[in-house]
Amino acid sequence: MSFTENIKPLIEEINPSFFEITVGMAFAYFVNQEVDIAIIETGLGGRLDSTNVITPIISVITNIGMDHMNLLGDTLQLIAAEKAGIIKKNVRVVIGESSPETDEVFLSVAEANNAPISFADKIRYTENWVHKNGYLVTDLIDKTNDVHVRCELDLPGYYQLKNLVTVAEVVCHLPALGFELQPDKMLYAFKHVKKLTGLHGRWEIIHQHPLVVLDVAHNEDGMKELVKQIELSDYHELHIVLGVVKDKEIEKILLLLPKTANYYFTQASIPRALPAELLMQKANASGLNGHSYNDVNTALQHAISKASKQDLVLVCGSVFTVGEVRLRGV
């Protein structure tokens, strides 16, 4: 409140968006807390995003998918060009996933800005991953020296393996920027991500028997990864509580979801949410069947009541849908 009160005249003068105000609030908070490192994530794209006023110590682009195409472009190359807008002069950029469609875009922008560039998945990889006691356990291998490091992650979704490779590549460049790297603390951080960061909703198990999982997958690429995770899971029947927002390519998402699941269509309490009844109609057209509920937690309780102890109950489709479950619990 004090932040917004202090800048109220400026808000009235330039009429910033809600996101722009929260970005300013975050920057002010980081300054006041004197943080050593702040991880700033773009809201949408990169080139024109309000977070892009900073000059970072390292730029990171995880991967490129077909999302926000109405604003960023309808090809991977166009979307990559927008994302590449965060590449700054003489500042290293790490690309998480290489791709024939986008590599040249990043290489070209990096060269124009004299920015050192590395592709994480060309330098490191993971193997021998297993789930153990709620953790994702894997070997992280450096291709340049064949060093193997055993890592445990408290984010158990197998898709975190890609993120681990990206993070490891970023971290290895920190000593050159004046930061002391302590491998034991890095491994501790991997194992305690949720506790250290408050990051939730990434194949997050919140209940056993039945297994209740939250995942914020909300676009085509994210849903593809989520479906792979479902296929790797052991369960009797699958119950999916699904709520989405209006501005996503909903039909593409629906076509990816398993038709054998029991669906509980719902909506978060925000204006952007697609009404549950309309979502159900679109889902029916894609061969997905279930009932609609106007409240996320009501939908979840119905799913749990129908599930056996061996079943999997998954809440997904939007950050807002998952967020409402976290507010009230199971």
Model feature map: region roles:
Residues 99-109, 114, 211-214, 220, ...:
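C-terminal helical cap/extension that packs against the catalytic core
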Residues 318:
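Active-site-proximal loop/hinge segments that shape catalytic or ion-binding/gating pockets
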